[in-house]
């Protein structure tokens, strides 16, 4: 069910904001109905007339993460959710709300990680580049992330799909010899399309929120069932 919902959500993004067939004022698909387009040099493509292209840093605040010292046990086991790329890799989910290890207030204060509000967009920026998730809880991350706090939190789903759609270009920004990493400076300058059709955009957000809410409920149910299974299996194996 979750995969079907995700296919719908992605299709909605592609159809409206990649092909530009969002509903015009008459409810007809904009570009297919002859909506005016103009060439944009930064994106190297046509976009609807009146739409803008900004730097990512003007659309969202971009935050780094960090790791508290692992030699001090007092830094770990608290109630602050701390996310690593491994968490995203293991969970394979559009949403993240818990990690393998929490950190304490002391751990948080001891390093340069940042607290990210609910609906921030997390993107792994090295080893590998491009795991993406939306935070459904206040979280912080290790240094394997660049995270985005949209200036308007209603933009988080659009930002999630925009980054996902452009992940190949973002990967190409990676530098480094041991493993490639995308720098905050390069992401700050990355272009983002700002939607000009405000009524259509509001409509799109309502549709996406509806899908996302269903997906998140299912994600939590699956996580609870998986936990239950993992606890019961050893007991069954031992004949209990």
What are these regions (language model features)?
Residues 1-16, 32-67, 189, 198-240:
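Non-catalytic DNA-recognition/assembly elements of restriction-modification systems
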Residues 17, 23, 27-31:
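Short, surface-exposed recognition loops and adjoining beta-strand edges that mediate ligand/DNA contacts
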Residues 21, 49-56, 61, 71-73, ...:
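Extended non-membrane alpha-helical scaffolds
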Residues 84-86, 100-166, 173-175, 183-185:
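A short beta-sheet element
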């Amino acid at each position: 069910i979750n995969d079907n919902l995700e296919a719908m959500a992605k299709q909605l993004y592609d159809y409206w904001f990649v092909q530009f067939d969002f509903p015009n004022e008459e409810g007809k698909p904009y570009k297919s109905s002859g909506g005016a387009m103009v060439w944009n040099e930064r994106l190297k493509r046509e976009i609807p007339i009146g739409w803008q292209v900004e730097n990512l840093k003007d659309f969202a605040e971009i935050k780094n993460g960090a790791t508290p010292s692992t030699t001090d046990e007092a830094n770990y086991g608290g109630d602050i959710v701390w996310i690593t790329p491994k968490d995203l890799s293991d969970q394979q989910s559009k949403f993240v709300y818990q990690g393998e290890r929490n950190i304490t207030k002391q751990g948080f204060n001891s390093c340069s990680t940042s607290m990210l509000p609910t609906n921030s967009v997390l993107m792994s920026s090295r080893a590998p580049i491009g795991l993406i998730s939306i935070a459904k809880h206040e979280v912080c991350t290790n240094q394997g992330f660049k995270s985005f706090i949209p200036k308007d939190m209603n933009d988080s789903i659009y930002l999630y799909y925009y980054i996902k759609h452009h992940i190949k270009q973002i990967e190409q920004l990676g530098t480094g010899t041991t493993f490639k990493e995308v720098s905050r400076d390069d992401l700050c300058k990355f272009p983002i399309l700002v939607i000009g059709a405000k009524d259509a955009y509001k409509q799109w957000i309502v549709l996406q929120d509806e899908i996302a809410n269903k997906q998140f409920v299912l994600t939590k149910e699956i996580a609870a069932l998986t936990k239950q299974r993992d606890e019961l299996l050893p007991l069954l194996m031992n004949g209990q």
